[in-house]
Amino acid sequence: MLKQAKKKGKPVIYHTHTTYEDFRGSIKGSYVLSPIIKFWTKKLYNEADYLISPSEYTKNLIKSKYLEKDKEIRVISNGVNINKFNKNEVLKEKFLNEYKLVYDINKPLIITAGLPFERKGIKDFVKVAQECSDYQFLWFGSSSVKSMLPDKIQKIIENPPKNLIFPGYVDKDILIGAFSAAKAFLFMTYEENEGIVVLEALSAKLPLVVRDIPVYEDWLEDGKTCFKARTNEEFCQKIRNIVENNVENLDEITETAYNIAVERDLLNIGKKYKEYYEHILNQKNR
């Protein structure tokens, strides 16, 4: 398809959402397969005329480790639907009614979402749940991949601590209800190209606790738009500060963070794509 497009004089654009770094620590054999992933992504990214990355971090990663010669890379966020991901009292009650027989809904709720990969920090998430045993933890994410996960991760999902539940994939209304009921969103990933669930948490004005990794350096600020941690002890402390109201300006932090989601609303992202595609076509017609 790439060669056919080039023969017809059509510009080829690739989205750099797949990287060697992002693939490791996912499914069974990912550490063995990741060099193959890097070989093919490197080949394809070099053959493309234009590249689009979801973050400055990914852009710099592609430039430094994948491209053989300099190439234009435009950064355009994955985006978030801010009209869908906002706190909703009706959906909150729906969620609590559905889960009141599953866990003690009087406990402070800490949530996360995403595929339960090792790279996503699932082992540390379990340790934090054990340390903060007076809180309830939920990890939302497709359970259909369970058989593809390493045995050690499958065992975690099958035998979690009493205060941790893996509901798997849930209806969007239930998920938004959980966002509305939770005290914090805990995202302990070790590697990310942006993190759509991060944008969803910001959009819902849910206090966000993330691992202090390079992808968040230039757009999430500790104590201003989120809370960053490096160790499990730090994660526990950040969560406790939020739950126990030991953060004086928490509302201000979530409001400032919400502005990031507004900037990355899908309507704005659509405009950016339109502008960039028009720019590419203008370049072609010169």
Spell out what each predicted region is.
Residues 207-210:
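Short hydrophobic beta-strand element within catalytic cores of glycosyltransferases
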Residues 169-170, 177-182:
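Short alpha-helical donor nucleotide-sugar binding micro-motif in glycosyltransferases
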Residues 222-233, 241-247:
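Conserved acidic donor-binding segment of nucleotide-sugar-dependent glycosyltransferases
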Residues 11, 22-43, 60:
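Nucleotide-sugar donor phosphate/pyrophosphate-binding loop at the beta->alpha transition
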Residues 190:
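Aromatic "clamp/platform" in nucleotide-sugar-dependent glycosyltransferases that forms part
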Residues 57, 79:
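Carbohydrate-associated surface elements
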Residues 136-163, 174:
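Short, structured helix-loop element that forms part of the nucleotide-activated donor/catalytic region
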Residues 102-120, 126-130, 138:
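Conserved donor-binding/catalytic core segment of Leloir-type glycosyltransferases
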